[in-house]
Amino acid sequence: MLNDIPTHLIAGPLGAGKTSLIRALLAQKPAGERWAVLINEFGQIGLDAALLHRDEAGVSFAEVAGGCLCCVNGVPFQIGLSQLLRKARPDRLLIEPSGLGHPLELLQQLRQPPWQQVLALQAPVMLLDATALAGGAALTPSQQALAAEAGLLVLNKSEGLDEAARTG
């Protein structure tokens, strides 16, 4: 029986670097562990999934396309996650919701039956595009709410900013 799988939600706006972070994490995966990655694509074409999918020992991928994971009572998500967990029997689970989704609603679903005994939710990780924020891009209300709840905020893409923008 599967239980207490460390589960990491890696969220943020479109283009913030979620898929790149997951690729970097996968490169650091201990050889003896099995990991699973569930990716949500808002559209029907799974670009992020295509970027991640490759033959990698001990890593299983699944994708839920066509809307955010928490919508439509989460039925596609529930099915996709259930199938992934049964197939992969992972030691760790990474979930990348769409940058257009509602990650806090997804976390609420994961805290409910049947997942509460199966998954050990870790504090969410939120990536933000520092260059976009410095240029005046605004976070949606759901992104602002996640930023307040995140265990780790990563300001990505800051290398193009001058020192004043990075520190101020």
Model-identified regions with their sequence ranges:
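G-domain G4 guanine-recognition motif of GTPases
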Residues: 97, 127-132, 150-168
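A short, aliphatic-rich alpha-helical micro-motif
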Residues: 87, 144-147
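Charged helix-capping and loop-helix junction motifs
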Residues: 138-142
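Nucleotide-state-sensitive switch-loop elements of NTP-binding domains
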Residues: 2-11, 16, 20-136
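Short amphipathic alpha-helical segments and helix-helix/interface helices
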Residues: 26, 96, 143-144, 167-168
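Structured helix-beta-strand junction loops
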Residues: 32, 149-150
